[in-house]
Structure formats: structure tokens, C-alpha cells
A protein has these predicted regions:
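NTP-dependent small-molecule kinase module
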Residues: 11, 15, 61, 125-158
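Walker A/P-loop
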Residues: 6
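Hydrophobic/aromatic beta-strand patches that form the interior of the parallel beta-sheet core
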Residues: 21, 87-89, 137-139
């Protein structure tokens, strides 16, 4: 959350002549409501199943840069599918940089707007070990310009 997955993915896809696919955007488009509304109306488990369905559509996909929501790794089936599809890059961000990026955004369903830092710390504590275990590469995006991050990723994927 707040690591720049979507914005970096779009730029990277353009620079590498690959197509870009944002799983969250596909879900929003298909459901006709934003992620916060989906969480509120149907719950997190429903949303995680939507992520799984979107990944299942990508079984034989090539030449794509794919951005996922940060919680996609909470289902083992999603991890297995992502590993089958291609490389998993973890855009890691330190808590201070993350807080700066998301503190004024009120549409994050897993963030308590009255206690943003505690919410982020809890998510990070739970998710980061999973990412560290499953990813092929970790890219620290804390306090870096997008062009620097993209060059780091290009060295890996090209």
C-alpha cells in the first residue's frame, strides 16, 4: 500500500513495450464500485476471491507487467498462481515513507483513518514476512524517485 505499484507498473510497461494490467482496476471495472465499497458491502474475503478470479484469467499471459493489491498474498492459491505466471517483485517501503504517501487518502478499506500509522504497522508486520518469503526480488522504494526504481527493476527483468 502506497509503494507505487500501479504508477511504477504503468511507466515500466511503457518503457519495456509490455502491456500493463492492474488487478485492482480490473476488479473495480468489473464490479462497478471501488474497493472500499466492495469491502464495506461484501467483506474482505469476497474481495480476496475476486483477486483470485482475476489471477485465474492470467494463466497463459506473457509480456505483461501486473500490479496487484498488497493483500493478494493472503491466499496461498494466489501465491501459487503468481509464481507460475512470472517473477514476483516486492516493492518494499519503510513505514515513514508509506505513512507520508497514504496519510491523506481516506479510501483505504484496511486503514483506520484515526490511526493510520498503527494500521500500516499492523499490515506491514503481517504481510512483509510473507512477501519476503515468496518474492523473487525485493526493491526498496522508500524515498526514491520513480525513475530510479524503474531502472532497478529494468536491470532485473530485461
Amino acid at each position: 500500500m502506497g509503494s507505487g505499484k500501479s504508477s511504477i507498473g504503468k511507466i515500466l510497461a511503457k518503457r519495456t513495450s509490455k502491456k500493463f494490467l492492474d488487478i485492482d482496476f480490473q476488479i473495480i471495472k468489473n464490479q462497478g464500485m471501488n474497493i472500499s465499497e466492495i469491502f464495506e458491502k461484501y467483506g474482505e474475503e469476497y474481495f480476496r476471491n475476486l483477486e483470485k478470479k482475476e489471477l485465474e484469467k492470467l494463466d497463459n499471459i506473457e509480456d505483461y507487467i501486473i500490479s496487484t493489491g498488497g493483500g493478494i498474498i493472503l491466499k496461498q492459491e494466489n501465491i501459487d498462481m503468481m509464481k507460475k505466471i512470472g517473477l514476483i517483485l516486492f516493492l518494499d517501503i519503510d513505514i515513514n515513507a508509506q505513512l507520508e504517501r497514504v496519510k491523506n487518502k481516506k479510501n483505504r478499506p484496511l486503514i483506520d483513518n484515526d490511526n493510520v500509522e498503527s494500521s500500516l504497522l499492523a499490515l506491514k508486520k503481517y504481510r512483509d514476512p510473507i512477501y519476503n518469503n515468496i518474492c523473487d526480488y525485493i526493491i526498496d522504494v522508500s524515498n526514491k524517485e520513480k525513475n530510479v526504481i524503474i531502472k532497478e527493476i529494468e536491470k532485473i527483468i530485461l
